[in-house]
UniProtKB/Swiss-Prot annotation:
It comes from Solanum lycopersicum (Tomato). Expressed in roots, stems, flowers, leaves and fruits. It is found in: Mitochondrion. It catalyses: succinate + ATP + CoA = succinyl-CoA + ADP + phosphate. CoA binds at T58, G59, K60, N61, K84, I137, T138, E139. It is an enzyme of class 6 (ligase). This is Succinate--CoA ligase [ADP-forming] subunit alpha-2, mitochondrial. Pathway: Carbohydrate metabolism; tricarboxylic acid cycle; succinate from succinyl-CoA (ligase route): step 1/1. Substrate binds at Y201.
Amino acid sequence: MARQATRLISNLSTKLNPSSPTMSASPLWHQYRYFGSPPPPPAVFVDKNTRVICQGITGKNGTFHTEQAIEYGTKMVGGVTPKKGGTEHLGLPVFNTVAEAKVETKANASVVYVPPPFAAAAIMEAMEAELDLVVCITEGIPQHDMVRVKAALKKQLRTRLIGPNCPGIIKPGECKIGIMPGYIHKPGRIGIVSRSGTLTYEAVFQTTAVGLGQSTCVGIGGDPFNGTNFVDCLERFIADPQTEGIVLIGEIGGTAEEDAAALIKESGTQKPVVAFIAGLTAPPGRRMGHAGAIVSGGKGTAQDKIKALKEAGVTVCESPAKIGVTMLDVFKQRGLA
């Protein structure tokens, strides 16, 4: 079955190539049209107008988290499970393909709860259907599959992928796509972006406790090949008028935090940024939790990341327990609280 999934990914990669005959002839790229004026695009990827389908809706995880999303108030409009099209689940229509679901429900986002061997193919299917946003929660997707997905993402401009191996994205009070506990979030002023799911929840709880709340929270995931990075989110947070402060939670491995520091410095933003970097005592060459959390070749150390962030004017916390109070202190120092 894994080989079948690999072949499907390869076929979809060909279809996603804009120069291929399949792409130019496919009706999927022209069938979704707005009648009347469409709502304005969300400031940070999602808002109350986001219409979401669930890929893998009839599975255990898909069922549970779709129920949670509906209860939170997310506009869940349908689901996709091959060979179960035409049925209903949780009161929502189920379709065989993402393309069918998009036509019938006018969905513009998808959340993927599909087992690792088939998750990349599910992402590619959503890309072929030209959804605006795909959020992949699945952990353990083979890296060679994600390399193909990453290459396909670079060949198109319509679809944004958040994840994989991430908690998802939430705009408190409006839209929850993912596995995060909704009740700890509160509409507010802080944009949160993180490579760690549990540390995201910690930052959310603390910013809620000090009365600042959150504008949008994005878990970008800890895998080496993900769809959305710190820079993508920071650009949105800097431009978003609702976001008055930013929390960035990074970890060892890669150069994503250094890239974020460069953007913050170049942007000249006056919005306060507070960061925490996990893995300060991690030994080189040993993976720490996430697949991407590894110091190799002398690069990706916590010390390097902390130095780069401080040089960009970011306030760096030594403990994750101090994220909320640190942000509140910075707000008070700048007369924002």
